Amino acid sequence: SGSCEVKTCWWAQPDFRAIGDYLKDKYDSASEMVVEKHRESRGWVETLRAKYALFKPPTERDLVYYENSPNFCEPNPETGLFGTRDRTCNVTSHGIDGCDLLCCGRGHNTRTEKRKEKCHCIF
């Protein structure tokens, strides 16, 4: 009689939170670039260079950008952004629905509401 051994290997997807954290770190440390046009024998060529020479140049694995993101705090009819003014925010949240982030440093008004509703309770 003989013995049989089976090994199975596969790649597992990392935890979704870990992926999000990784991408957020990349976003927070992204390098701003400048598009430069110069003439070569084959015509005009565009290249990217770091906007600030004081910082080390980005690697192939770094995130880079050459246009700033729109200001999501203020309305912009051209891009269809409504801004965040008069949005409801969560005072106790540190997430994207929190007042600190959603109100863009403008401050917020707190409103307390009392409502009377029929609850259709049966005792």
Curated annotation (Swiss-Prot):
GO MF annotation list: cytokine activity; frizzled binding
Residue positions with a glycan: 90
An example Gene Ontology biological process: cell fate commitment
Q: Where in the cell is it found?
A: Secreted, Extracellular space, Extracellular matrix
Q: Name one GO cellular component term.
A: extracellular space
Q: Which UniProt keywords apply?
A: Developmental protein, Disulfide bond, Extracellular matrix, Glycoprotein, Lipoprotein, Secreted, Wnt signaling pathway
Record bears the keyword Cell division: no
Post-translational modification as stated in the protein's UniProt record:
Palmitoleoylation is required for efficient binding to frizzled receptors. Depalmitoleoylation leads to Wnt signaling pathway inhibition.
The record lists its disulfide bonds as 89-104
State one Pfam family annotation. Answer: wnt
Q: Where is the lipid attached (O-palmitoleoyl serine)?
A: 1
State the family it belongs to.
Answer: Belongs to the Wnt family.
The job of this chain, per UniProt, is described as: Ligand for members of the frizzled family of seven transmembrane receptors. Probable developmental protein. May be a signaling molecule which affects the development of discrete regions of tissues. Is likely to signal over only few cell diameters.
- From the Swiss-Prot or TrEMBL record, give the protein name: Protein Wnt-3b
Q: Give the organism's phylogenetic lineage.
A: Eukaryota, Metazoa, Chordata, Craniata, Vertebrata
Gene assigned in the entry: WNT3B
